[in-house]
Design a protein with these regions (language model features):
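A Rossmann-like FAD-binding core segment of flavoenzymes
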Residues: 88, 92-113, 120-123, 182-273, ...
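Beta1-alpha1 glycine-rich phosphate/pyrophosphate-binding loop at the start
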Residues: 11-89, 174-202, 271-272
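Residues at the starts of beta-strands that form the adenosine-phosphate
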Residues: 5, 28, 163, 185-188, ...
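FAD-site-proximal beta/loop scaffold in flavoenzymes
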Residues: 144-158, 255-304
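Predominantly flavin-linked oxidoreductase catalytic cores and closely associated redox partners
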Residues: 102-104, 116-189, 193-204
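Glycine-rich, N-terminal phosphate-binding loop of Rossmann-like dinucleotide-binding domains
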Residues: 11, 130-131, 253-254
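Beta1/beta-strand and adjacent pyrophosphate-binding region of the FAD-binding site
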Residues: 2-14, 162-167
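A conserved FAD-binding loop/helix module that cradles the flavin
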Residues: 294-332
């Protein structure tokens, strides 16, 4: 078994940033990713445009270019592939981490690859940078397991001419509803709040509000889906329950980090926010030797950490780890 100074779990932008900063300091690291490199970005809508500018997505001091003011998904995927190759990061794709055993300085990370073959990686330190996009917030209603229920919106074409419901009231729900509407789907928006969230981007909100006002997109506020059936959905409204004809349901209800994995591995979480307790200077958890990076630091408040600020976690953690390893301290001396 190859021994590494650090195992980084997750190869999204934050995980890549950790790998880069460790390599810059001469700290050996392997990144283990359950999907492909930047798997969450790969699963974004096909034609998605970021709400930010290229320089705010950059890692490793490698410039990102875009044909427009805001980069799109394809440009981001190309950029992170290029950065990974430039730094020659050791990334094990399509390999899922099952558990972490051992203690600070003598961990073993256990995983299984896509063929089910087990692997073990001895390491002195571990960084959790798993993100949250692979765990949707479920509706917990009958019928949610039907194939017509979709938690990850990709593109509108397959839903042309169909009756679709979009659940949610934030950016992803608004964008999904508009995209489906403009492509010829019959769209109903269902949201438990009084109105669309104020967090919906300023250039999107008036657009969807006008479509709702004109009746082009039907909307039920202060409402929720209570039952999903093969060709319909039952919606609970303030007045009564309404049965709607339905072909597809897009549950744009957000996502959450793998809190169970952290708890099972001795990482204590705040009971209310579910934020892990970490040292703010090193992002080390209360389980000594395990550091957290990216959105995991925010617990259930996933709207606080983005690529734009999570990318800086790598430098902070790498500096702390490099300073703690005996061979690096000896080299400095």
């Amino acid at each position: 078994m190859s021994r590494f100074d650090v195992v980084v779990i997750g190869a999204g932008p934050t995980g890549l940033a950790c790998g880069i900063e460790l390599k810059r300091r001469g700290v050996s690291a392997v990144l283990i990713e359950k999907g492909c490199v930047v798997n969450s970005l790969y699963n974004y809508p096909t034609n998605m445009v970021f709400f930010t500018t290229p320089e705010l997505l950059e890692i490793g001091d490698i410039p990102m270019t875009s044909l427009n003011e805001k980069p799109n998904r394809t440009e981001a995927l190309k950029y992170y592939r290029r950065v990974s190759g430039y730094y020659d990061l050791d990334i094990r794709q399509y390999e899922r981490v099952e558990s972490i055993s051992g203690d600070d300085g003598a961990f073993v990370v256990h995983s299984a690859d896509r063929h089910g073959c087990p692997h073990a990686y001895p390491a002195k330190k571990v960084i959790l940078a798993m993100g949250y996009y692979d765990r949707p917030n479920l509706l917990n209603v009958p019928g949610e397991d039907l194939p017509k229920v979709i938690h990850y919106y990709k593109e509108p074409h397959p839903y042309y001419g169909h009756d679709v419901a979009v659940i949610g009231g934030k950016n992803s729900a608004a964008i999904t509803a508009l995209d489906l509407h403009w492509t010829g789907a019959r769209v109903t928006l269902i949201h438990r709040g009084e109105a669309l969230s104020n967090s919906v981007k300023y250039w999107i909100k008036p657009n969807i509000e006008n479509r709702i006002k004109s009746g082009e997109i039907k909307a039920y506020f202060r409402s929720s889906v209570v039952d999903i059936r093969l060709d319909s959905i039952l919606v609970g409204t303030p007045e009564d329950e309404v049965l709607l004809k339905n072909d597809f349901v897009f549950a744009m209800t957000g996502y959450h980090p793998d809190l169970g994995f952290m708890s099972a591995h001795g990482i204590r979480l705040d009971p209310e926010s579910r934020r892990p307790y970490t040292d703010p200077e090193t992002l080390e958890s209360e389980r000594k030797g395990i550091h957290l990076a990216g959105v995991l630091v925010a617990g259930m408040h996933t709207n606080e950490i983005f690529i734009e600020n999570g990318r800086f976690h790598g430098k902070k953690i790498a500096e702390a780890i490099a300073a703690s390893l005996p061979q690096h301290n000896e080299a400095r001396g």
